[in-house]
């Protein structure tokens, strides 16, 4: 249940007064905070005020146009058809609506425009149609089931889609990630065994927080104890590659409560942990709360500093601006590929999914009803997109690559585009290097620890002048939010 602001204000004060950060951790966080020239960085655009959003694609969604429904199959010299594909499948059904979520989703109440059984049938039809146009001999390297809540599917639905995927050409070490919510697996070991027995080898659990009060504000349908039971079940099911998602800068959250969540999660020694700052979509319920209920801007920065310290204390490596792994081998391969220079082809299916085929970035319609009608009619359910030219493809390599521990490999970039990245983006790279955000070597251009901190702002540095101008006209910096949601 969503908490009214009047009640929340009282809860926040009472609970935060009773939670204190230990002195040593507070000193370490403050020491890290004091050494950064925040004002100097902000003067060059490196701050997190305004319409902050994690950058996961390029071009940004607010700059896209309508495209032909099959435009992603146009041949491209710079992005020729790959024999190694990544696949993303969107499952929009959820047990309820979180107060902050802006992804394509519907409540699984039996009244949606497309039933779950039909959705799986149509999803298979969409994948088949796309593979037929793209080239059915392409081998699948990675699969990610996202949502929504994929783990809301019934066992027979999981078996059906996984059986279909196994009929396709797959690489021997194909990575299959399945997103789960605690309320669907905390008391359902059989569902986890179904996932494992049908080829899923990586589980992503949406934990978000271990503070029950904060979870209530987020309108999550689980509590901390449910998360703990879920993690026990996931391990009992035999999964050896597990990631959890966490969110910070939430209303009602203090630095102390964030550190407590991070420490407990770290002690589980899961293979990887993803941490995201809250993205406050202006149309979501959580954005209607009074500003005083949120952590201060400075505390939001301290929370970001804190997750680096806590994860390092527990033996984790930072592998992306928002991801940590216990070993480098446990980095999610799909994320690494789609943020790289090569092997970036992403075939996506399902309502509200986005993909990149040949040189075209595309979004499927976010309306479940429209998606169903178009797939039934034999159409590709494309909504928005853009075919990228050479300049935008080079920029895409940086916009997405600046988040990763490998950065942008100079030889790989030069082999693809025929030029060293310094010759193209010398001014941008030079600025980031002078500000201490980039390390430039003979082999690669990589983010420093401070660069990781400003990964999204580094991405914006490589937006094209045309896109910057377009976003300026909209009063936006990142451009990652749609103007409105259409799910029905």
Name these PLM-found stretches:
Residues 452-488:
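Short, amphipathic alpha-helical interaction segments positioned at domain boundaries
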Residues 1-85, 481-486:
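Flexible, acidic/Gly-rich N-terminal and inter-domain linker regions that tether
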Residues 445-452:
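Basic, amphipathic "hinge/linker" alpha-helix immediately C-terminal to the N-terminal HTH DNA-binding motif
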Residues 433-443:
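A short, conserved structural fragment
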Residues 419-431:
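Short amphipathic alpha-helical interaction segments
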Residues 413, 428-435:
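Basic amphipathic alpha-helical segments that dock to polyanions
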């Amino acid at each position: 249940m969503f908490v009214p602001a009047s009640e929340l204000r009282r809860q926040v004060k009472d609970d935060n007064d009773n939670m204190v950060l230990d002195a040593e951790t507070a000193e370490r966080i403050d020491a890290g905070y004091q050494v950064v020239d925040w004002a100097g960085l902000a003067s060059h655009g490196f701050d997190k005020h305004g319409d902050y959003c994690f950058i996961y694609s390029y071009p940004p969604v607010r700059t896209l146009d309508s495209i032909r429904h099959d435009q992603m199959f146009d041949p491209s010299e710079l992005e020729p058809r790959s024999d190694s594909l990544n696949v993303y499948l969107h499952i929009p059904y959820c047990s309820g609506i979180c107060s902050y979520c802006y992804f394509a989703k519907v409540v699984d109440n039996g009244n949606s425009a497309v039933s779950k059984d039909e959705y799986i049938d149509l999803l298979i039809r969409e994948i088949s149609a796309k593979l037929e146009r793209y080239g059915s001999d392409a081998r699948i390297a990675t699969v990610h089931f996202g949502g929504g809540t994929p783990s809301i599917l019934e066992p027979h639905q999981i078996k059906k889609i996984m059986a279909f995927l196994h009929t396709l050409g797959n690489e021997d070490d194909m990575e299959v990630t399945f997103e789960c919510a605690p309320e669907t697996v905390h008391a359902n070991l059989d569902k986890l065994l179904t996932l494992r027995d049908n080829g899923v080898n990586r589980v992503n659990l949406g934990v978000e927080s271990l503070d029950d009060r904060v979870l209530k504000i987020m309108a999550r349908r689980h509590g901390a104890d449910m998360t703990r039971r879920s993690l026990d079940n996931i391990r009992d099911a035999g999964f050896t590659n597990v990631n959890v998602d966490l969110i910070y800068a939430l209303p009602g959250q203090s630095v102390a409560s964030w550190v407590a969540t991070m420490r407990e999660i770290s002690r589980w020694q899961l293979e990887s942990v993803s941490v995201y700052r809250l993205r406050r979509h202006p149309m979501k319920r959580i954005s209607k709360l009074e500003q005083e209920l949120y952590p201060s801007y400075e505390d939001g920065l301290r929370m970001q500093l804190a997750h680096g310290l806590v994860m390092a204390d527990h033996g984790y490596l930072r592998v992306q601006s928002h991801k940590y792994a216990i070993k480098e081998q446990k980095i999610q391969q799909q994320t690494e590929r789609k943020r790289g220079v090569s092997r970036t082809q992403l075939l996506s299916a399902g309502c509200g999914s986005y993909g990149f085929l040949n040189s075209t970035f595309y979004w499927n319609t976010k309306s479940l009803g429209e998606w169903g009608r178009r797939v039934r009619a034999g159409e590709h359910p494309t909504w928005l997109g853009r075919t990228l030219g050479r300049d935008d493809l080079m920029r895409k390599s940086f916009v997405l690559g600046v988040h990763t521990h490998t950065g942008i490999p100079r030889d790989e970039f030069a082999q693809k585009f025929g030029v060293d990245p310094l010759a193209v983006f010398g001014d941008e790279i030079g600025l980031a290097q002078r500000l201490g955000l980039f390390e430039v070597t003979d082999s690669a251009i990589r983010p420093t620890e401070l660069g990781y901190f400003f990964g999204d702002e580094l991405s914006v540095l490589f937006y094209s002048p045309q896109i910057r101008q377009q976003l300026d006209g909209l009063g936006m910096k990142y451009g990652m939010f749609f103007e409105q949601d259409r799910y029905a």
